[in-house]
Amino acid sequence: MAQSRDGGNPFAEPSELDNPFQDPAVIQHRPSRQYATLDVYNPFETREPPPAYEPPAPAPLPPPSAPSLQPSRKLSPTEPKNYGSYSTQASAAAATAELLKKQEELNRKAEELDRRERELQHAALGGTATRQNNWPPLPSFCPVQPCFFQDISMEIPQEFQKTVSTMYYLWMCSTLALLLNFLACLASFCVETNNGAGFGLSILWVLLFTPCSFVCWYRPMYKAFRSDSSFNFFVFFFIFFVQDVLFVLQAIGIPGWGFSGWISALVVPKGNTAVSVLMLLVALLFTGIAVLGIVMLKRIHSLYRRTGASFQKAQQEFAAGVFSNPAVRTAAANAAAGAAENAFRAP
């Protein structure tokens, strides 16, 4: 067919219509030399180098944020850390609160177990067991050793521990008031020399009332609550009533008695403000001690009536204590033996 179209010349150039590679549909899908790729690049086809690779332009960096001027807050040991979620923080706070609550409960149980252990040890020791004295708390190098054993948390029942502790603090306050009374009387004596008798009596009251009040009314009260002793209750009521009367007299402050009460503070000569203020403070302290003493006497009496104690029980305890005393029994035996010997020698 080609020969018929070209006039039968076999050397004629083929026309574009007879070349299948010149078809417009094929030419459209041929790759362009301007954008040659590695797959279709022919180094022998042209002497021009391939186009240079152009990397994509980098994205612009965000501007740096300004540093915060607010100082970082230090978290407390119990505060949960911020993990970026409100629900997480709430759950962490709840867990921490629950742990603290459990820890407090465990501490209370541990204290209760310690108290019960001390009570069991006290019951195992018994009343006749020997224990090392610990009061007054003197240093080891002191030649005078402690005279009493005192442990309110171990020896006193739990429902009476607060009352016994209050009475112990009352005794300490009365001792402090006597020391301040001595200083006030000394200041008054320095201002007015005719107050020598009151100053001398203030020294006597410090030396006399401090040990006697502890032995005569505090120790009987302590032993009464420790062993539910009716006899010690009666001893305490009698002596502490007298002590309350003395507290009232100390607060009144009769001149010349050695007490810096209200009357003694008000009769200080004018111009001695410091001495007057010191004596008024002592009078106020004496008044507070007197009021607290009366209140505690009434309170302990109400506790005594609820314990089932009575005067007959006190008599029985006194008789049992007297007859169980070895010295009393020895004296009674010697007296009986002497009486019998005299009876046999009589004509």
Curated annotation (Swiss-Prot):
Modified residues (Phosphotyrosine): Y41, Y53, Y83
GO cellular component, one term: trans-Golgi network membrane
Tissue: Widely expressed, with highest expression in heart and skeletal muscle.
Region span, Disordered: 1-88
Modification comment: Monoubiquitinated.
Gene Ontology MF terms in the entry: ubiquitin protein ligase binding
Cross-linked residues, Glycyl lysine isopeptide (Lys-Gly) (interchain with G-Cter in SUMO1): K313
Chief place of localization: membrane
Pfam families recorded: SCAMP
PANTHER family membership: SECRETORY CARRIER-ASSOCIATED MEMBRANE PROTEIN 3, SECRETORY CARRIER-ASSOCIATED MEMBRANE PROTEIN SCAMP
Function of the molecule: Functions in post-Golgi recycling pathways. Acts as a recycling carrier to the cell surface.
Binding partners and assembly: Interacts with NEDD4, NEDD4L and TSG101. Interacts with RNF126.
Annotated protein name in UniProt: Secretory carrier-associated membrane protein 3
Organism name: Homo sapiens (Human)
